[in-house]
């Protein structure tokens, strides 16, 4: 992977998007024309319209990811770097602090803390575990699970590497759910950390991955968020194993394809991402809208 900073001007970014969406449009148009030939002739006009509309929606979605994957394949084949990101050596020392956040809501405490311990041990092996702290942010409403969380936390603290702190906090009221949980953390403790890695309750991330994300954020001051593509693991059923295999085979290709045309304008998937705390606090607070959900609140 190239360590040089690749900057794309707006025109090149626009050209990338025109290519991907243009190919998607042409593919969908040709497929739709073919589809109209096989629609039963005795169908009503309304039925034909609905069949064509549903076909266009589903085929366009597939075509978008198909062409994104084609471009992603060549990006990986020629080892092109991510535009706008300067890659750094693996032994780059961190001078910043990162909080690893795991919001939970009536989860299995043993699994939550087992995953955190595994990640903490892996981080400690990198030799830079002291740059990270871990937080369990609980919105649990079940009293039994709440007690179990605290018990597991006390046990986990005894097993944690000495270089990494593990904190536990439960809110009495789970206002705004997960987003409110993250907001509460930022308001009370965000000033102590440069970055935060937001996990899901069942997330399991490699220590080297978390370290690399923190290194990239520290050395790319213009970057506000880096999203790690999630991958399914630990499945037992045949269907789950098939999903895991598929994700392993073409997951990186799809991710590279999305990065090809989204560049620096991608969306936050809700977890498995590192975020610049100060920028997040300054720019990502949303007002409460009038009216009832989903259009208000």
Regions found by a protein language model. Name each.
Residues 1-92:
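N-terminal membrane-anchoring/stem segments of glycan-assembly enzymes
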Residues 14, 67-297:
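Internal catalytic domains of large membrane-associated glycosyltransferases
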């Amino acid at each position: 992977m190239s360590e040089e900073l690749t900057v794309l001007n707006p025109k090149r970014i626009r050209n990338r998007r025109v290519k991907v969406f243009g190919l998607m449009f042409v593919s969908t148009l040709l497929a739709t024309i073919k589809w109209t030939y096989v629609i039963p002739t005795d169908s009503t006009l309304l039925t034909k319209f609905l069949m064509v509309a549903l076909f266009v929606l589903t085929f366009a979605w597939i075509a978008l990811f198909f062409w994104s994957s084609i471009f992603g394949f060549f990006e990986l084949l020629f080892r092109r770097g991510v535009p706008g990101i300067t890659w750094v050596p693996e032994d780059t020392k961190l001078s910043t602090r990162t909080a690893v956040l795991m919001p939970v809501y009536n989860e299995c405490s043993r699994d939550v803390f087992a995953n955190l311990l595994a990640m903490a041990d892996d981080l400690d092996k990198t030799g830079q575990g002291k740059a990270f702290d871990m937080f369990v942010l609980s919105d649990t409403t079940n009293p039994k699970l709440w007690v179990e969380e605290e018990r597991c936390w006390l046990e986990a603290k005894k097993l944690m590497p000495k270089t990494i702190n593990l904190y536990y906090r439960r809110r009495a009221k789970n206002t705004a759910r997960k987003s409110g949980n993250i907001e509460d953390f930022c308001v009370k403790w965000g000033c102590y950390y440069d970055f935060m890695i937001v996990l899901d309750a069942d997330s399991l991330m490699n220590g080297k991955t978390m370290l690399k994300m923190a290194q990239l954020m520290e050395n790319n001051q213009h970057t506000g968020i880096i999203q790690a593509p999630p991958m399914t693991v630990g499945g037992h059923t045949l269907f789950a194993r098939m999903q895991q295999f598929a994700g392993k085979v073409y997951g990186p290709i799809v991710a590279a394809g999305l990065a090809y045309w989204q560049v620096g304008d991608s969306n936050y998937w809700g977890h498995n991402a590192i975020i610049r705390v100060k920028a997040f606090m300054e720019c990502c607070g949303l007002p409460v809208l009038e009216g009832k959900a989903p259009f208000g609140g």
